[in-house]
Amino acid sequence: MVTYRPVPEGREDDLKRLLQYSFVPERGNAPESYRLSRPPDLYDLRGLFEDGDLCSACKRYRFDASVRGQRRSIGGLGALATFPDLRRQWYARRLTRHVLEEFREEGIDLVALWPSTIDYHRKQGWGIAHEFRRYEFTPEQLRFADRPAGRYTAVTGDDWERLRGVEQGARRTLSLRRSETWWRERTLGDWAGSGDPFAFGYERDGSLRGFVVYTIERESGTTPHEAVRRLRVRQLSAVDDEGLRALLHFLGGHDSQVDTVELRRPPECRLLERVRAPETATCTVEPGPMVRLTGVDALERLPWPETLDTEFTLRVTDPLVEANDGRFRVTVSDGTPSVEPVATGGHAGDSAEDGGADAVTDIETLSQLYVGTYEVRRAEQLGNCNFEESVIEPLSEVFSEEQLALSAFF
């Protein structure tokens, strides 16, 4: 019999063996070397057990995040793994379904993950929330601005509240309000086993206006003279453009120390238009985190315009959660929404059920609309959805495109 339950502390050896094989197999068969830090307020562990044996496991997070201007609790799914001899037997799929159901029971509407294989998660209803642009510059290219009026200062875990204030000042959907433990153990700590990162802030008039967290790595070449030092930015946050320019200027000051500066920014941060000699830079577009709604009734917790009155039928397809796969009546009165399932006589997948629905979408696209990956017209072009003209205007009032940035990896 397969059961879903927390992974007890007494099973840590099994868990280390699973996670070491799944995520760092290049270290060889040495699960005892895998670091499994378990601060109680960072995550908890869930697993599928069959006849007492651990088959599949994951880390389950809870975050305080910004969603369309509201402070909300969202879930996080990380380190999803199955033993190699048990793969392709639906364990990971079943584990994911149980995690989503548990989050829904706890009142969590939205869950995020960092995908290892995007197509795999897409088949289970997850959608890419946003993209990143990864840049590689020489340090000299970042010295395009005059020296800023403020000053630079080293920051540590003791500054976590000031750092959090900077991140919240950026006002982006999916930005996390991280706990003190997260700042100390993850953002500024050696959680990956590669050493503590460096961290500096930019201050002006006594106020922290931005900060950057980074590592410096040496990459060997075929000869000692070909070795490259790379400054890799883990996180860069600023409350305004002055803070951003100041931090880029700070990174540019490493020209005598490193050969390359690598950083990742949201797509609207168009650094090629600012740096010197942009034709010599490298810029690649990469998929970011994925998101998924736990239930269609999550629409009831969105901030709908107070003057909006509308009613429409919504057809949703969900390959993983049966309760989401069907038709729903959405009613909005004076900005207060109500979502109710509509009973149908046929099979949930019958095309006849789509007849008469004002809006048809899969859970992936609905999740992207929910966080603001697309606005409605763009979703029709890029997503798997179709909207009657009568609902385009009211839906556009709630599903506007947002600036998104979930930068914390988990």
Give the residues covered by each predicted segment.
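Short amphipathic alpha-helix that is part of the acyltransferase structural core
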Residues: 1-57, 70-76, 142-182
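Intrinsically disordered, low-complexity, positively biased terminal segments
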Residues: 2-5, 9-12, 154-410
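Conserved beta-strand in the GNAT
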Residues: 47, 53-63, 76, 81, ...
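A conserved beta-turn-beta hairpin within the catalytic core of GNAT-like acetyltransferases
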Residues: 65-76, 87, 219-232
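Conserved acetyl-CoA pyrophosphate-binding loop and the N-cap/start of the following alpha-helix
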Residues: 86-95, 242-246
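Conserved GNAT acetyl-CoA-binding A-motif
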Residues: 103-115, 256-266
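Conserved active-site alpha-helix within GNAT-family acetyltransferase domains
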Residues: 107-109, 115-133, 268-284
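Aromatic-anchored glycine-rich loop motif in surface-exposed flexible loops
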Residues: 130-146
